[in-house]
Amino acid sequence: MKKLGLFFILLFVFIQSPVLAHDGESELENNKKFNGIENYDVITISQPGVLYYSVTNQILESVNNLESNVTFIGRANIGLEKIIDTSNQESLETNEDYLYSLSIKTIESKYADLFYSNQITELIQKNKIIVSEFTAEQYSINVGDTLVLVGMNEVTSEIEVGEIVPDAELGWFEAVVNKEVGYQLGINRNIQAIIWDNKVTENHFVELYKNIEYKQLRVTFKDAKPNKNWVLPTALVKKYFGDFQIKEKDGTWIIVEPAWRNANIERKNMPIIGRTTCNKIMWEPLLGALNQVMEEGLQNTLSKDEFQKSGGCYAPRRINRFNAGGAISRHAWGIAIDINVKSGYHPRVVQIFNQWGFAWGGTWTSPDEMHFELRDLSPSISQTGS
């Protein structure tokens, strides 16, 4: 039993995970890039979706016992209804009952200077929203503009843009606000705890392990190695595969604006799996992967029956495997596909899909073994010579 207990402690401490999470975010905090946090040893703790309240309280208890420091990062997808420029003119307006979706991070004002410059910290503390460069380009956002946002609580708020910064500075979130503004937007959830101290020792990990009852956590310390099945953050998904307005349907399923859907989504017959509906950009890498599966004699390891009954590619919905804060599934872009929904994949099939630019969900913190997600078009370009 002692050996088994030691094994769980080591697993808890050293488990690694994708730098880019499934709903498109990375942890800037892991990089320890900005003024302040790089002067400390840092532990980050997260779990699929949202940190449970019990986990949050047990982290607080541990940090108190250790006399260390902790802050919590929040995140949710918020609706963008319109943009009002500095001349009080609407520079962007959505269709009736439709919204764009933004992935917004929240941070405690008093700790913002650990991660951001003094200028950005001051703007965050003044209740401004900091927007990433790709997002600003996507929606023609300028400093001083007012974003009209519809929160998770369905309350409409107007927030001024304080600054536009490189996406990496925001950890590939589309925007960041302080916790108070986040609460106004209905973002009451935390996705990550950041613990820091002058020196982290094994006592920190023992204390955390002793107090936190839920063990399916992602814990990183120092330089975490990225999982090979990392995925694109939302800003890059929009840049490479397009963006669309959404209309709520039932909390999970959404309605994608018809103009985008008609221009980007189509139905075709594919080898092995038969008829499917995907983003047009998917056809070349998907066809390449399926053809190679056949060339290597592995076609019988993929189940057309499972795919046709409960698998699929295009599915306009939010992520529903865990509390993902309203994050839009990559299936809504038609760039993810679930084939063997029950029987799993042959390891070589996973390798083939990786080679054709797909990430596989089987190694994520919350495994999604049936899921392949397109993240890179360069393999299909180089292998087809087009």
Regions found by a protein language model. Name each.
Residues Y40, V55-T56, L60-S62, N77-K222:
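Basic-flanked hydrophobic alpha-helices used for secretion and membrane insertion
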Residues Y314, R321-S386:
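Catalytic cores and adjacent binding grooves of peptidoglycan-active enzymes
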Residues Y240-D305:
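Active-site acidic/histidine clusters and adjacent loop/turn architecture
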